[in-house]
Structure formats: structure tokens, C-alpha cells
């Protein structure tokens, strides 16, 4: 479902933008913030290009501490945050908020571990879907959920959208292939879901 975002006056938008940029500048480097129109235009929509909205600010953190600090700061300012992976989705899931911050997680792109014995991988949320299969290929393994955008889409976006693909007819959707997720609430509190082991049958 696409939710219509408010249309603030230019003065309201500029005033809030200045407050948000000033506050976020205290928790992330200057190069991690984008707010000029020419810089934020690529973030106006995801793959559903019929709907566009320029975000107030785009933030590109590089560490988990920065993500947490950004979320806490925005929560204190009562500014909405929309997380964004590669922006390939067709559901409007990464649609920006006119008076909000787009939190780009593209820099979290490391594959931390591939374990052929347990047939598991530990990856950051910005890792491309296809990159996981490429890393597992030397062990004759692959990551089953394979959306048509797998060459570009990220695992974080796949988790958020419960992405599928042709292989899902046999191996299930993303939810059936992810054991554990670590992240933050919108208030910036750390959370974990699942575990590193499969559930015991029964």
C-alpha cells in the first residue's frame, strides 16, 4: 500500500531540514549527509518509479553505532526514518517521507562468514543477493531466494520485503532461509530475532 505523504510549505521544509542536518552532523561525518536536491534526487523512489518524493535528508552511515545514533536523534526530533537498501523493490517500501530521513544502508556490504559445514553465511544488510551465492559457489552452495533483481538487490531489502524468486517454489521465501536478524528499533534500541541454529522439530 502506498501512503500519501504530506506536502509541507518550502519554509517549513527548510526549517526542519536545517534542524535535522545540524543534529545529525553531531553523530555522523559531514560526507554522510545529503540534502541538496541534486544529491537526493536518486533517492526519490525505489523501483516503483510512478511514485516519487524527495526526502528531507539522506544519511549514509558506515558503522552500527552511527545507525543507532541516527535513529535515536531522529526519534528525539520526531522525524520519520525510512530505511533503504538498493532501491530495487516494486512495492514502494523505500518510498521517502517528505519530512523524513532516508537511511541508506548501502555501505554495509561485507560478507563476514560463509560456513559450508552448517550451510550458513553471516552477512551485512547491504550485501547484494547474488554476491551471497557467488561467495558460496566454491562450496557448491547457493542462496535460494532469487528475485529478478538479485544482481542488485540487497539482503536487507529482501528481509524487509520477504522476497521470493523461482527457487522459492522448492526452498521457500526469504523468511524460510534466514536464521537470525540483528538490528535496531526506530528508537535506536538493539534487537535480535531468531538464532544461529535451526529450530528443533516438534
Regions found by a protein language model. Name each.
Residues 76-77, 97-98, 177:
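Short, well-ordered loop/turn elements at secondary-structure boundaries
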Residues 1-72, 89-119, 148, 171:
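N-terminal flexible segment immediately upstream of the FAD-binding catalytic core
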Residues 79-80, 142:
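Residue-level detector of anion-binding/catalytic polar loops
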Residues 110-202:
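FAD-binding subdomain of flavoenzyme oxidoreductases
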Residues 84:
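Conserved PLP cofactor-binding pocket of PLP-dependent enzymes
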